[in-house]
Amino acid sequence: MWRSYLVFLFFMTPRIQTYCPVPVLRSMAVLNIISPLIIFVSPIKKQDSLHSSACYANLTLVEKLQLWHSMSND
């Protein structure tokens, strides 16, 4: 799981920088790719984490940012 994300990130990061010249858009695009990792990094029970990641995939970017912000404040 982690290896596939890292390989994907390794190949996608240069393309994101090419397609998104504006730094804000670039950082949002990178965050949108990295954000599913937050579910696995956060201290959630294993069975809850699988359910959360399935629900997490349906969130918009704004909702992901709000969730990430609330998790980092705990």
UniProtKB/Swiss-Prot annotation:
The UniProt record lists the keyword rRNA-binding: no
Bilayer topology term: Single-pass type I membrane protein
Subcellular location: Membrane
Residues of the signal peptide: 1-18
Residue intervals on the Extracellular side: 19-21
Regions crossing the membrane: 22-44
Superkingdom as given in the UniProt entry: Eukaryota
Keywords noted in UniProt: Membrane, Signal, Transmembrane, Transmembrane helix
Topology, Cytoplasmic side: 45-74
UniProt main location, coarse: membrane
GO cellular component: membrane
Function: May be involved in the regulation of telomere length.
Record-given protein name: Uncharacterized protein YOR008C-A
